[in-house]
Amino acid sequence: VLTRPAVEAGERLGFLPGDLVQKIDPYLRPLYDALYELMGFEKVQKAFERSALEIAPLAFMRGRTLNNAFIILDEAQNTTPEQMKMFLTRIGFGAKAVITGDVSQIDLPKGQSSGLIEAERILKRVQGIAHVRFSSADVVRHPLIARIVDAYDAAGSAARRGQDRA
């Protein structure tokens, strides 16, 4: 099961036309793109046909129990604390969950806490939960991306040092 929150990056596009599938497709498109790249279009389609693969918006997870499933929550930095708790409490028997997110790319409204940051703080001592942090050395996209990440990290560090002096 693949899921992610429906949060836009910066600009708000407003209401989208069409039925439910057409409305949520733009938010889930990155998951489809990654699957097609990894498995190929035909294998992905066959996995959907066999119900071996499911992509669902995070908003539709409430009330579910995901037993014997491998669940990936992508872009978790854009969950609210309430959404994160709701997601974490969907994990059923025999299930494993992987939560990914980049806390330097939070697109939530100003003043809204990230569920990923809060979950890491709350769950850091809970047995059976591990946290892994990656750096620019782990970037698998174009080599330029690692340098971009480093430049933004350096600029952020410099800005924080400047705020500390104020």
What is each of the regions a protein language model found here?
Residues V1-L73, Q77-A166:
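Conserved helicase motor core of SF1/SF2 NTP-dependent helicases
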